[in-house]
UniProtKB/Swiss-Prot annotation:
Coiled-coil portions: none
Name by which UniProt lists this protein: Alpha-crystallin A chain
GO cellular component, as recorded: cytoplasm; cytosol; nucleoplasm; nucleus; protein-containing complex
Lineage: Eukaryota, Metazoa, Chordata, Craniata, Vertebrata
Modified residues (N-acetylmethionine): M1
Source organism of the structure: Bos taurus
GO molecular function: identical protein binding; metal ion binding; structural constituent of eye lens; unfolded protein binding
PTM info: Acetylation at Lys-70 may increase chaperone activity. Undergoes age-dependent proteolytical cleavage at the C-terminus.
Length: 173
C-alpha cells in the first residue's frame, strides 16, 4: 500500500485526524472521551496513534530560551514536588531528574520518573544559576549570560529548587 507523505503545514491543518509520532509524553494521564472514539483511531498504520488534544504547557514538553542576556528552561513538572526533583550542573550540561514513588490517583496507582539533560551555552554564569517551581508546577531554570572573554567556571554542583507561591509567568505558546 502506498501512502503519500504530506507537507507539515497540511498535517497541522488536519489536527487530530492526522497520525502523529509513535510516542508522546503523556504517560499515566488517563483516558479521555475522544480516546475511545473509533473514528479517531488511525487506519493508516498500527504504529501511529493520534496526537492528544492538549496544550503545549500541559504536555510536559520543555521550552528553552537563550537570548542575549540570559538562558532559561521552562519545564512542566506538575506531578512532582520540589523534594521529588534533582537539578544539577555537570560541566556544560544541566540535568533535571524527577521521580516519585507509586501513589494513588484518580485512575489507580501511578509512579513517574523523567530525566532531562540540556547543554548550557558556554557564556552562562554558572555561579548565578537558579531554579524555582511555581505553584502551577512550572519549573524555571535560569542563568545570566556573561560577556565573552570572561571564564564561566565549569564545575559540578547541585542547584536547589525553590518553591514559588504564584503561578508561572511562562509563555503559553
Amino acid at each position: 500500500m502506498d501512502i503519500a507523505i504530506q507537507h507539515p503545514w497540511f498535517k497541522r491543518t488536519l489536527g487530530p485526524f492526522y497520525p502523529s509520532r509513535l510516542f508522546d509524553q503523556f504517560f499515566g494521564e488517563g483516558l479521555f472521551e475522544y480516546d475511545l472514539l473509533p473514528f479517531l483511531s488511525s487506519t493508516i498504520s498500527p504504529y501511529y496513534r493520534q496526537s492528544l488534544f492538549r496544550t503545549v504547557l500541559d504536555s510536559g514538553i520543555s521550552e528553552v530560551r537563550s537570548d542575549r542576556d540570559k538562558f532559561v528552561i521552562f519545564l512542566d513538572v506538575k506531578h512532582f514536588s520540589p523534594e521529588d526533583l534533582t537539578v544539577k550542573v555537570q560541566e556544560d550540561f544541566v540535568e533535571i531528574h524527577g521521580k516519585h514513588n507509586e501513589r494513588q490517583d484518580d485512575h489507580g496507582y501511578i509512579s513517574r520518573e523523567f530525566h532531562r539533560r540540556y547543554r548550557l551555552p558556554s557564556n552562562v554564569d554558572q555561579s548565578a544559576l537558579s531554579c524555582s517551581l511555581s505553584a502551577d508546577g512550572m519549573l524555571t531554570f535560569s542563568g545570566p549570560k556573561i560577556p565573552s572573554g570572561v571564564d564561566a567556571g565549569h564545575s559540578e554542583r547541585a542547584i536547589p529548587v525553590s518553591r514559588e507561591e504564584k503561578p508561572s509567568s511562562a509563555p503559553s505558546s
